[in-house]
């Protein structure tokens, strides 16, 4: 249990550093889209790779729950949505639908890629 908590915490530290690196490199307007899109795709790939094994459970916790959980940012997405809702209701709805759709689609593609790579590796 303690090792699992440590894996999530250490992954969270790495993910936070990664997001900070993107924050200082990319304009604020596109930051959330890039972070959540890349993070969702990576989450899908990793979940695909880890889908049929519990052998690397701590690595999965480190990479998915910890690192990518800290890298992506649902709270900032929610705050941005609320700010848009104050004056631009239609724009806020479009923003929420597009962000959610983008992340789900990228996570799905990532998962298919990850599970496909895993199956290809098992055949070799």
Give each language-model segment a name.
Residues 1-124:
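Membrane-interface helix-loop junctions in multi-pass transporters/channels
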């Amino acid at each position: 249990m303690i090792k699992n908590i440590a894996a999530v915490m250490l992954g969270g530290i790495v993910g936070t550093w990664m997001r900070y690196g993107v924050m200082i490199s990319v304009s604020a307007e596109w930051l959330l889209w890039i972070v959540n899109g890349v993070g969702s795709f990576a989450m899908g790939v990793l979940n695909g790779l880890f889908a049929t094994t519990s052998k690397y459970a701590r690595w999965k916790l480190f990479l998915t729950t910890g690192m990518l959980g800290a890298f992506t940012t649902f709270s900032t997405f929610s705050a941005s949505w609320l700010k848009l809702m104050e004056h631009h209701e239609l724009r806020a709805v479009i923003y929420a639908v597009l962000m959610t759709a983008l992340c789900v689609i990228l996570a799905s593609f990532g998962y298919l890629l990850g599970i496909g790579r895993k199956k290809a590796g098992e055949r070799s």
